[in-house]
Amino acid sequence: MSKPIRIGMVAGEPSGDILAAGMVAELKRQYPDAIIEGIGGPNMIDAGFHSLFDMETLSVMGLVEVLAHLPAILKVKKQLLAHFEQNPPDIFVGVDAPDFNLRVEKALKARGIKTMHYVSPTVWAWREKRIHKIAKAANRVLGLFPFEQQVYDKYHVPYTFVGHTMADAIAIEPDQNAARQELGVESNAYVLAVLPGSRRGEVETLLPVFLETIEAIHVKRSDIQFLIPAANEHRLAQIKAFLQEANNAEERLPIQVTQGTSRDAMIASDVILLASGTATLEAMLCKRPMVAAYLLSPLTYKIMQRLYKAPFFTLPNLLANEAIIPELLQEEVNAENMSNQLLNFFESDNSALIARFTDLHHTLKCNADKTAAKAVVEELFA
């Protein structure tokens, strides 16, 4: 009897856990006896993955936090590589977390193990030369966005576009009434969803100016309601505390704060104000006009001005290769500017923009879990 296939895999954060879980489920469906092990989160484990270490060890953000956790991270890397030396996988797939995974991939590739990297680092936007490091680490890159292909072709690095799991999960025509019922919002209400980010620092920076924007809109259009979905219980407490300090804003303005319902809030809304990031992709897939904003520290902004090469910083504009949504940075992020742009969406026919969002949704809807699993199997037997 032939021995089961062994697949090594590492996801370093919750987004990677969600992304990898569907691929793990698909691989287990095709090869029920396959041993898929490494580091993963609860979604991967539910799909049949064996996690050797707690994913939380790798889930750290920011330079200072990473430095504080570095000894623990290096210890995990050493133990993981020792495990794979004793139990060599037939193929290894690093899911995002490039700082950790590219090092693991390079070490395994040097031992003759096939390696893949799922989710391209942002080489198309800045530090393009990182692609040489990727080429040394991975036999093939699996990417989420079609515009990435160009830079990999330029350096002759094998790349497969697999689409985005979020595009598979969200309906082409999301049900606004169902989302409104879920959140207790009237079917005929005018609604602005406000998403100031999922990290403490983002909320701290953006919520004050977002609240000023809400107040500016309320002066002109008192019939508009505001939904603020908090990413988790920590952000919920942070948002509620800020609104209370801001002259009890939740009571004096038509604001509803919820937790863990960002997609419902997006679908329930007519227009969205949000922090730039993956949320802009989700808003696009929900077919809602949006204004995206971001504030960087002056030093970070100066550095990024020199290093950042892409023409846009929001995913809808990068995917469309033109400015289809307003993306605002630094001094552009002010209440007057944002309230005017948002009110313009409320008072305009947005059907052409929605049609563009729909086209882009179809581009990304490729059954990513199956496509990624197929690419892994093809590489495994190549």
Curated annotation (Swiss-Prot):
InterPro entries: Glyco_trans_19. One of its GO terms (molecular function) is phospholipid binding. It comes from Alteromonas mediterranea (strain DSM 17117 / CIP 110805 / LMG 28347 / Deep ecotype). PANTHER family: LIPID-A-DISACCHARIDE SYNTHASE, LIPID-A-DISACCHARIDE SYNTHASE, MITOCHONDRIAL-RELATED. Pathway: Bacterial outer membrane biogenesis; LPS lipid A biosynthesis. Keywords: Glycosyltransferase, Lipid A biosynthesis, Lipid biosynthesis, Lipid metabolism, Transferase. One of its GO terms (cellular component) is membrane. CDD domains: Glycosyltransferase_GTB-type (cd01635). This is Lipid-A-disaccharide synthase. SUPFAM superfamilies: UDP-Glycosyltransferase/glycogen phosphorylase.
